[in-house]
Curated annotation (Swiss-Prot):
Potential calcium-dependent cell-adhesion protein. May be involved in the establishment and maintenance of specific neuronal connections in the brain. This is Protocadherin beta-5. Residues 711-795 are cytoplasmic. Residues 1-30 form the signal peptide. The modification N6-acetyllysine is found at residue 296. Residues 35-133, 138-242, 247-346, 351-450, 455-560, 567-670 form the Cadherin domain. Coiled coil: none annotated. Glycans are attached at residues 169, 417, 435, 566. GO terms for cellular component: plasma membrane.
Length: 795
C-alpha cells in the first residue's frame, strides 16, 4: 500500500509518499524471526530488547507496547525481561492460507519519546494436513477404440500445506492398461493425468476399478486416495476440442452475482451422442472456485462475490466431454480488477489525555492507517481541521503522530474535539473519520488577580471590635488547587503602623475585620497591602492596596479655651460705660475634637444678669453690647454662654463670663467673686464718689504704666504685663481646633495685651510650651490673633 504527503489550503493534510514507506526511524530496522506453526503458546520467540539494543528497564520507563494490525494480539512482550512471547498457538493455514511466505508484521511502539521498531515473524509450514480428493470416486468413460498413449485428465487432490509438504506425486494401483503421469501447473501445484498403455477390449473387460493415491513431500509423507471407475464404451473416433486452449479475461471485483464472465466453446466432429459436448469445471475446483459453468452452453458465471484483496486472480480449468467419454480441456485465466471498495482504516495505538497546557511538541496520539485496495485506491491522505493547534507527523510505515503545534492555554480552551480524516485517492474517494477528545490539564501559569487594584473602606469610629469592615476578592483563571486563593496581610510600609493590632483578614474569603475600636481623633486613615496567593507549585501571588478611612462620630463635646472655666481666679472683662452699641466685650473661643459638621460650632447667650444688654454672634463667639450703657445698669454682670456643635445628636458646653462696667481705667480692679448677684444692687452715691475720686487720683499714673506695659507686651510675649491667671495643669487631651486641622495634645499659654491708644486687647494662642509630636499640619498654631477690646487681667 502506498501513501503520499500532501497539503491543501483548506486542510493541513499529510500523505505518505511511496518513498516514505521505506523510511524508518533511526535505530528501527526490521527484525525478523521465524518459528514453525502450531508452536505452543508461551513460547519465547526471542529477547526483543537485546536484539534492538534496548535496556530491559527502558521498555517499562518508555511505555513499550506491541501494535498489531487488526488489533489481534498474537505476540506478547514481557517488559520486565524483554522477551517476545507467543500469545497463542498459530495455524499458518488459517492465518495465511496459500500465501507463501507467511509473514506477520508487528510494530514495537515506545513512548516518551516516540520511536517505532518493525518486527516480522515468519511462520514456517509443518506437514499437518493430508491430501484429500474432492470425490471418493471418479468416473471415466473410455471407448474401446482409444489408442494407447491417450491422456485422460484427473481431478487433483487438495493439500492445505505448502511447499514440499504439499502434494508431490500421484500413483495408481498396479494394472496392465494405465499409468499416472504427474505434471506441474503454472502456480507450482501438481496435477495427475491417466495415460492409456494398452488398448481396451469392452468384450473382455467392460469396467475397471483403480485406486489413485496422492502423496505429499513431508517427513513422514501423508497420502490420500480415491477410486477411478473406468467404463469401456463402443468406438468414439473424435474427442472434443476447444477453440482456444487459454482464455484470458478481467473481472471487476464488484461484479454482481450471476454476471457472465466468459463463454468457452468446444466442438466434436462425431455425430449423434458422440458429438454432443458437456462442459464442467475440472480438477475439483467446484467447491473453492466462485464460478459456475453451464454444461450445455459453456457460459461461466459468477456465483460468489469476488474480493481482489483476498484473491487477485484465478486459474480455472474447463473440461468438455462428449457422449462417448472422450474429453478435452482448456484453461481460463481470470484477473480480478481492483475497485475502490474499501474505505481506509484507522487504528489508534495510543492516546494521551489530558495533556499539560505548557508543553509544545507533546505527542497526543499515535495511530496507523491502512487500505487493502491497490494503486490509487490504496493511496491515502490524512488530515485534521486546520483551525487547531495540532499537527500530524508521519513516522514509521503507515504510522502518524498527532502532536501539539504550540503551547496550549487551558484558560482559553480546556478541551479539543479533533476529527482525523483518512481519504483514499480512488474513484470515488472513500474516507474514514475518527473523533478524539483531548483534554488540556491545568498548569499554574496565572497569578490571582484582585477585582480592584485598590480598595477604599469606610469605618465609623467607635466601632465594635471584630466588626467586618469590608472584603477583598481575587480570582485565579487556573483550576483545581492552582485556583484556590489564600489571603494575607502584607507587612506595612510604614514601620510605625501597628497593623496587626488594627485589622485582620480571613485567609479563605478575604473578609477584613477591625480588631479594636477606632478613634477618628487619634487615627483618621491608614493603608496597607493585602496579598492573594494560590496553592499551585510554584505558588503565584498578587497584591492590592487597601485604604481605610475612619469616619468621624460626634463623640466630643465642644471645649471652651477662653475664658477658662476651671480657673481659681477667672478673668473679668472691663467695659467702659461710654461704650457704643456693638462694642466688642470679649470673644469666646472653643474647639471641638471632631471634624466636619460635628466640629461646626455655634454660640448662644444662654443667661445674662440683665437680658438685652449684651448680644452674642452665633458663628464667631463675639460678645458685644446691644445698646448704650446707662448709669442705671449694674456694674457687675454674669453671662452664661452655650457652645453647641452641629453633630447628630448635638453636643454642647457652657462658659461663664464676668463683665464689669467701669467709667475709666485709672486703677486695676480686683477680680470679682465667682458668683455675681443675680440682680443689680442699688446704686450708691457714696460708691460713685469713692470710685470717681480714686479714678481721678490714679489716672495719670495708670496711663503711664499702661503705656509701658503695652510696649513690653509687644516686644516680648514671654513676659506680658497684663495676663490672665491660668491654673497649672494640661488641658484635656486630643483637642482639635475649629477648622479640624489637627490634635492639641499639650498645654497652651494665652496672653491678653491691652494697648493704651486703641482701647482694644489682643488674644493670642501661643505655641505649646513643650514640643509635641503631632500629625502633619497639627503643629501649626491653633489660634490666630483675635482682637479683644478692653480685656484686662488682674494678677
Amino acid at each position: 500500500m502506498e501513501t503520499a504527503l500532501a497539503k491543501t489550503p483548506q486542510k493541513r493534510q499529510v500523505m505518505f509518499l511511496a518513498i516514505l514507506l521505506l523510511l524508518w526511524e533511526a535505530g528501527s530496522e526490521a527484525v525478523r524471526y521465524s518459528i514453525p506453526e502450531e508452536t505452543e503458546s508461551g513460547y519465547s520467540v526471542a529477547n526483543l530488547a537485546k536484539d534492538l539494543g534496548l535496556g530491559v528497564g527502558e521498555l517499562a520507563t518508555r511505555g513499550a507496547r506491541m501494535h498489531y494490525k487488526g488489533n489481534k494480539e498474537l505476540l506478547q512482550l514481557d517488559i520486565k525481561t524483554g522477551n517476545l512471547l507467543l500469545y497463542e498457538k498459530l495455524d499458518r493455514e488459517v492465518i495465511c492460507g496459500a500465501t507463501e511466505p507467511c509473514i506477520l508484521h508487528f510494530q514495537l511502539l515506545l513512548e516518551n519519546p516516540v520511536q517505532f521498531f518493525q518486527t516480522d515473524l515468519q511462520l514456517t509450514d509443518i506437514n499437518d494436513h493430508s491430501p484429500e480428493f474432492p470425490e471418493k470416486e471418479m468416473l471415466l468413460k473410455i471407448p474401446e477404440s482409444t489408442q494407447p498413449g491417450t491422456v485422460f485428465p484427473l481431478k487433483v487432490a487438495q493439500d492445505f500445506d505448502i511447499g514440499s509438504n504439499a502434494v508431490q506425486n500421484y500413483t495408481i494401483s498396479p494394472n496392465s492398461h494405465f499409468h499416472v503421469a504427474t505434471h506441474n501447473r503454472g502456480d507450482g501445484r501438481k496435477y495427475p493425468e491417466l495415460v492409456l498403455d494398452k488398448a481396451l477390449d469392452r468384450e473382455e473387460r467392460p469396467e475397471l476399478s483403480l485406486t489413485l493415491t496422492a502423496l505429499d513431500g513431508g517427513a513422514p509423507p501423508r497420502s490420500g486416495t480415491t477410486t477411478i471407475r473406468i467404463v469401456v464404451l463402443d468406438n468414439n473416433d473424435n474427442a472434443p476440442e476447444f477453440l482456444q486452449s487459454l482464455y484470458e479475461v478481467q473481472v471487476p471485483e464488484n461484479s454482481p452475482l450471476n454476471s457472465l464472465v466468459v463463454v468457452v466453446s468446444a466442438r466434436d466432429l462425431d455425430a449423434g451422442a458422440y458429438g454432443s459436448v458437456a462442459y464442467a469445471l475440472f480438477q475439483g475446483d467446484e467447491v473453492t472456485q466462485p464460478f459456475v459453468i453451464d454444461e450445455k452452453t459453456g457460459e461461466i458465471r459468477l456465483k460468489r462475490a469476488l474480493d481482489f484483496e483476498a484473491t487477485p486472480y484465478y486459474n480455472v480449468e474447463i473440461v468438455a466431454t462428449d457422449g462417448g467419454g472422450l474429453s478435452g480441456k482448456c484453461t481460463v485465466a481470470m484477473e480480478v480488477v481492483d475497485v475502490n471498495d474499501n474505505a481506509p482504516e484507522l487504528t489508534m495505538s495510543t492516546l494521551s489525555s489530558p495533556i499539560p497546557e505548557n508543553a509544545p511538541e507533546t505527542v497526543v496520539a499515535v495511530f496507523s492507517v491502512s487500505d487493502p485496495d491497490s494503486g490509487d485506491n490504496g493511496r491515502m491522505i490524512c488530515s485534521i481541521q486546520n483551525d487547531l493547534p495540532f499537527l500530524l507527523k508521519p513516522t514509521l510505515k503507515n504510522f502518524y503522530t498527532l502532536v501539539t503545534q504550540r503551547t496550549l492555554d487551558r484558560e482559553s480552551q480546556a478541551e479539543y474535539n479533533i476529527t482525523i480524516t483518512v481519504t483514499d485517492m480512488g474513484t470515488p474517494r472513500l474516507k474514514t473519520e475518527h473523533n478524539i477528545t483531548v483534554l488540556v490539564s491545568d498548569v499554574n501559569d496565572n497569578a490571582p488577580a484582585f477585582t480592584q487594584t485598590s480598595y477604599t473602606l469606610f469605618v465609623r469610629e467607635n466601632n465594635s471590635p471584630a466588626l467586618q469592615i469590608g472584603s477583598v476578592s481575587a480570582t485565579d483563571r487556573d483550576s483545581g488547587t492552582n485556583a484556590q486563593v489564600t489571603y494575607s496581610l502584607l507587612p506595612p510600609q510604614n514601620p510605625h503602623l501597628r497593623l496587626a493590632s488594627l485589622v485582620s483578614i480571613n485567609a479563605d474569603n478575604g473578609h477584613l475585620f477591625a480588631l479594636r475600636s477606632l478613634d477618628y481623633e487619634a487615627l483618621q486613615a491608614f493603608e496597607f497591602r493585602v496579598g492573594a496567593t494560590d496553592r499551585g507549585s510554584p505558588a503565584l501571588s498578587s497584591e492590592a492596596l487597601v485604604r481605610v478611612l475612619v469616619l468621624d462620630a460626634n463623640d466630643n463635646s465642644p471645649f471652651v479655651l477662653y475664658p477658662l472655666q476651671n480657673g481659681s481666679a477667672p478673668c473679668t472683662e472691663l467695659v467702659p460705660r461710654a461704650a457704643e452699641p456693638g462694642y466688642l466685650v470679649t470673644k469666646v473661643v472653643a474647639v471641638d475634637g471632631d471634624s466636619g459638621q460635628n466640629a461646626w460650632l455655634s454660640y448662644q447667650l444662654l443667661k445674662a444678669t440683665e437680658p438685652g444688654l449684651f448680644s452674642m454672634w452665633a458663628h464667631n463667639g463675639e460678645v458685644r453690647t446691644a445698646r448704650l450703657l446707662s448709669e442705671r445698669d449694674a456694674a457687675k454682670h454674669r453671662l452664661v454662654v452655650l457652645v453647641k456643635d452641629n453633630g447628630e445628636p448635638p453636643r454642647s458646653a457652657t462658659a461663664t463670663l464676668h463683665v464689669l462696667l467701669v467709667d475709666g481705667f485709672s486703677q486695676p480692679y480686683l477680680p470679682l467673686p465667682e458668683a455675681a448677684p443675680a440682680q443689680a444692687q442699688a446704686d450708691s452715691l457714696t460708691v460713685y464718689l469713692v470710685v470717681a475720686l480714686a479714678s481721678v487720683s490714679s489716672l495719670f499714673l495708670f496711663s503711664v504704666l499702661l503705656f509701658v506695659a503695652v510696649r513690653l507686651c509687644r516686644r516680648s510675649r514671654a513676659a506680658p504685663v497684663g495676663r490672665c491667671s491660668v491654673p497649672e495643669g494640661p488641658f484635656p487631651g486630643h483637642l482639635v481646633d475649629v477648622s479640624g486641622t489637627g490634635i492639641l495634645s499639650q498645654s497652651y499659654q494665652y496672653e491678653v495685651c491691652l494697648t493704651g491708644d486703641s482701647g482694644a486687647g489682643e488674644f493670642k494662642f501661643l505655641k505649646p510650651i513643650i514640643p509635641n509630636l503631632l500629625p502633619q499640619g497639627a503643629s501649626e498654631e491653633i489660634g490666630k490673633t483675635a482682637a479683644f477690646r478692653n480685656s484686662f487681667g488682674l494678677n
